[in-house]
Amino acid sequence: MFELESNSLFERRLERFSRRHPELQRRLSRLFRDLEEDPFQPHLRLHGLSGHLEGVSAVWLTYQYRVTFTIDVGQNLIKLLNIGNHDEVYR
């Protein structure tokens, strides 16, 4: 079981995202639950990023929206970094 950790910047982005996309709340709750259980589940489409985001991973919320984070497998810790559309989170 993994622990999810966020900072104030992620919390603000999550709040803004939730206000703009209330229809995705159930899916977002499931995504966070699934990340806690096992971030390597195939349906999450976990993938590592490269370039200036090397060391960061992402999962799909929908085809358009992503959540980015870092994983510390040794400590079972996921640090949430960003949520938003593809272009926003990969800047």
Q: Can you annotate each of these PLM segments?
A:
Residues 1-65, 72-79, 88-91:
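Basic, Lys/Arg-enriched alpha-helical interface segments
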Residues 84:
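Residues forming the ATP-binding cleft of Hanks-type serine/threonine protein kinase domains
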